[in-house]
């Protein structure tokens, strides 16, 4: 028996030794040839493959023989090398990959939660590079988003392809993310743009169309994802400071104050790799008096002092301080593991003005009760851990604590705490023998606690809770090295206080590469948006106009379908992409902020019960075409970059005559207003011609061109918006029927401004040397007086002097 065991062990060891002797190992590190930064590239040979870890290290074991090794990474030139391996050999091969400097490539992550060439994604996307933000001296990201094709910012609320209108800050159909984590407030679903770290943006990715499968409820019309930059071995230091002045109103009668309003600020960034530790530190300081006049007291008095960056005295003024930190550790003990924490702290004071005083002498002042002063404190902490396995697996755990405190001066404050957690498992099956196949699965848990004087419609003490649970799965497969297929499903469940609702949503898409740089795509995606705490329970007032709660409001659903083509081109030294898409988005239970007689006990004290409320208004549809063009041209020491787009939409109500709400007033009540007894799309619109939805801009033109000639740089931007045909008819009705209570001149303004808006910006800069640059940046150089949303004036001409210092690889 002992002899048999001995012989068996000897045979096993012999076989194992023989097997080991027949194989060989190739190992090494993959880096960027220019920056020496580690790259998570894929190495393939024969039917085997291996992915590098976060430090760029890889290892692949092969039988003896001669193989062609291929190394690929998006944005870098593919490397091929023939290697002959001998049995038992261990070969070191360090790989330095060259960036594709001779090709125009755009790499995105948002479309499928993994890196893809922008031409191969199945949805419509726009990408904005940070250079545009820096050159235009954009201090808050919403200013830069206005330059993106197909995107409009209406009073700080994002619209993508007319998928949303204006909700007075309650609810959003566009999900806003930073590094895939949502940043919309937990109570109102509203973005705080000044919180986002402008100083460390690597690029902005905009998905157009329903994206609820990957990004949840608020992605009904699209996603805006801000991606931050990782540090390199060489430190990066950036400093940008500016001082500017607004032009006075063109109409002297509207100017009731003396000196010009001013704006100043500073951004700073430091980032570096320290061994296995990545560190990013950023800060931003800004003081902006805005373009409106000084705040008046009850007697009409206002501040006449000099500019004080610590004090907010204008109706559009803001001061803000922000610090941010990104810390990532690449584990030395566990290969492939990295973990860390990101954090942002922001505090600022601002005035928000909803309605101007009147359309002549009061354009730059506020209607009584419509200006709110807010001291906002916003904090986020984002612990995370990511593990890259040997067989193409990626496990990621991302969490966030977000605390938002809006301390308002009119007893309308609110506070919310959000806890967010997402576990995601992603598998690249190439190392397991299935080429070009990636699966992504995840679980999401969100809990929100909110309290505030604004949200007493649910509980008298203003305390409300909300929760969200979701699971999702996405499959991405490439066939024949030309056809990309993507499909996904998500089940999402929401609860607010005691109400719970869940629903599955689906998406599918295909992208076919016809030629070297021609890509056809088709996609279908469903959306599901549960109302926010604000939409259900807000109780407040806008001067004399009340806002009412609607605890019975239902979730809205949608689908988005589109066909598109992206064409890459190279004409001499000019390279870029042209993209055209036709699309349709259909909504059910469409939520709109609607004016009506909502108080069951109307009196003169509550303005006959008139006010606004979020209600389900039936069906809606948006059809349109979207064209965009982006690219660059380079020769010698000169270059030109361009981004342009045109979007046409036809946003309509599909149920214009449906009575979607009735006034809760007894029919015998003498104060029942018959015009508001039954609410329909047509009856609540200022101009229901062709059933065009409210607060939509049907034509958008966006152009930005920047050129560099040696040390000099110039640039110009154009934004053109068509006339906003339809708004809430109540504004005009109130002005007609109750001029002593509400008379801002909206009827006259809209009659005189029917041609849309055309705004031009310009910039001119000089590089003193490789580190120092000075520039003059001007926005609205024609000093046009215009309002995208009626009753809210847009910025006057602003001229800034900018200084930039940059030290980076």
Please describe what each predicted stretch is:
Residues 92-95, 141-144, 159-161, 174-177, ...:
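N-terminal periplasmic accessory domains that precede
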Residues 240, 584-586, 608-730:
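Gram-negative outer-membrane beta-barrel transporters
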Residues 288-386, 402-420:
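Flexible loop and strand-edge segments within Gram-negative outer membrane beta-barrel domains
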Residues 59-61, 181-208:
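Short acidic/polar hinge/loop motifs at secondary-structure boundaries
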Residues 5, 385, 434-440, 453-585, ...:
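Structural signature of Gram-negative outer-membrane beta-barrels, strongest in the C-terminal barrel
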Residues 142-181, 185:
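Extracytoplasmic beta-strand/coil segments of soluble accessory domains associated
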Residues 396-406, 513, 521, 554-611, ...:
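Membrane-embedded beta-barrel scaffold of Gram-negative outer-membrane proteins
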Residues 29-36, 41-44, 72-76, 86, ...:
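Short, acidic, small-residue-rich periplasmic hinge/interaction motif at the N-terminus
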């Amino acid at each position: 028996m002992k002899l048999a065991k001995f012989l068996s062990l000897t045979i096993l060891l012999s076989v194992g030794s023989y097997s080991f002797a027949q194989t060989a190992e190739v190992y090494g590190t993959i880096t960027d040839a220019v920056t020496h930064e580690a790259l998570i590239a894929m190495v393939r040979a024969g039917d085997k493959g291996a992915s590098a870890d976060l430090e760029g290290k890889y290892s692949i074991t092969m039988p003896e023989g001669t193989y062609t090794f291929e190394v690929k990474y998006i944005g870098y030139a593919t490397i091929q090398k023939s290697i002959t391996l001998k049995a038992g050999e261990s070969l070191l091969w360090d790989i330095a990959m060259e960036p594709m400097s001779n090709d125009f490539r755009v790499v995105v992550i948002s479309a499928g939660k993994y890196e893809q060439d922008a031409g191969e994604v199945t949805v419509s996307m726009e990408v904005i590079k940070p250079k545009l933000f820096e050159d235009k001296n954009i201090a808050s990201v919403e200013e830069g988003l206005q330059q993106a094709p197909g995107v409009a910012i209406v009073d700080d609320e994002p619209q993508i392809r007319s998928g949303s209108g204006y909700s007075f800050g309650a609810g959003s159909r566009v999900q806003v993310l930073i590094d895939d984590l949502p940043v919309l407030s937990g109570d109102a679903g509203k973005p705080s743009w000044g919180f986002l770290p402008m100083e460390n943006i690597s690029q902005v990715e905009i998905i157009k169309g329903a994206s609820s499968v990957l990004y949840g409820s608020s992605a009904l019309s699209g996603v805006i994802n801000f991606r931050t930059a990782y540090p390199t071995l060489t430190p990066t230091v950036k400093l940008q400071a500016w001082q500017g002045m607004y032009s006075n109103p063109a109409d002297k009668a509207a100017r009731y104050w003396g000196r010009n309003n001013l704006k100043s600020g500073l951004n700073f960034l430091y980032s570096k790799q320290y061994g296995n530790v990545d560190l990013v530190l950023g800060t931003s300081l800004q003081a902006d008096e805005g373009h409106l006049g000084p705040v008046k007291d009850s007697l009409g008095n206002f501040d006449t002092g000099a500019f004080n960056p610590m004090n907010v005295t204008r109706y559009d003024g803001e001061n803000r301080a922000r610090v941010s930190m990104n810390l990532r550790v690449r584990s030395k003990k566990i290969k492939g593991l990295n973990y860390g924490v990101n954090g942002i702290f922001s505090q600022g004071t601002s005035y928000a003005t909803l309605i101007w005083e009147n359309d002549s002498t009061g354009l730059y002042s506020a209607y009584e009760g419509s200006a709110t002063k807010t001291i906002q404190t916003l904090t986020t902490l984002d612990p995370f851990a990511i593990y890259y396995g040997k067989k193409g697996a990626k496990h990621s755990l991302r969490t966030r604590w977000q605390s938002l405190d809006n301390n308002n001066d009119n007893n309308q404050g609110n506070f919310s705490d959000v806890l967010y957690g997402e576990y995601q498992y992603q598998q690249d099956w190439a190392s397991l023998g299935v080429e070009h196949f990636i699966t992504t699965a995840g679980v999401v848990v969100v809990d929100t606690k909110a309290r505030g004087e604004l949200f007493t419609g649910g509980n008298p003490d203003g305390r409300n809770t909300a929760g969200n649970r979701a699971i999702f799965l996405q499959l991405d497969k490439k066939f024949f090295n030309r056809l990309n297929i993507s499909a996904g499903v998500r089940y999402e469940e929401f609860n607010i206080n005691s109400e719970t609702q869940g629903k599955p949503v689906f998406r599918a898409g295909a992208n076919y590469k016809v030629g070297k740089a021609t890509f056809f795509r088709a996609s279908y995606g469903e959306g599901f948006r549960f109302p926010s705490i604000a939409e259900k329970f807000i109780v407040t007032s806008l001067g004399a106009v009340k806002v009412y709660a609607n605890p019975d409001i239902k979730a809205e659903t949608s689908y988005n379908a589109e066909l598109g083509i992206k064409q890459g081109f190279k004409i001499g030294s000019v390279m870029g992409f042209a993209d055209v898409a036709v699309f349709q988005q259909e909504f059910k239970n469409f939520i709109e902020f609607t004016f009506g007689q909502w108080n069951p006990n109307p009196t003169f004290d509550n303005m006959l019960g008139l006010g606004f409320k979020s209600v389900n208004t039936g069906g809606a549809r948006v059809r349109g075409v979207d064209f965009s063009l982006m690219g660059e041209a380079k020769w010698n020491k000169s270059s030109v970059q361009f981004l342009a787009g045109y979007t046409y939409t036809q946003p309509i109500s599909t149920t214009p005559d449906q009575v979607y709400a009735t006034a809760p007033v007894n029919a015998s009540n003498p104060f029942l207003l018959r015009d508001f007894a039954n609410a329909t799309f047509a009856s609540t619109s200022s101009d229901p011609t062709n059933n065009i939805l409210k607060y939509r801009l049907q034509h958008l033109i966006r152009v930005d061109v920047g050129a560099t000639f040696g040390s000099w740089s110039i640039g110009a931007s154009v934004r053109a918006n068509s006339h906003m045909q339809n708004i809430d008819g109540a504004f005009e009705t109130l002005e007609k029927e109750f001029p002593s209570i509400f008379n801002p001149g909206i009827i006259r303004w809209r009659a005189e401004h029917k041609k849309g808006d055309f705004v031009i910006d310009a910039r001119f800069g000089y590089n003193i040397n490789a580190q120092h640059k000075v520039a003059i940046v001007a926005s609205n150089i024609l000093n046009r007086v215009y309002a995208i949303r009626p009753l809210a004036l847009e910025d006057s001409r602003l001229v800034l002097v900018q200084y930039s210092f940059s030290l980076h690889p």
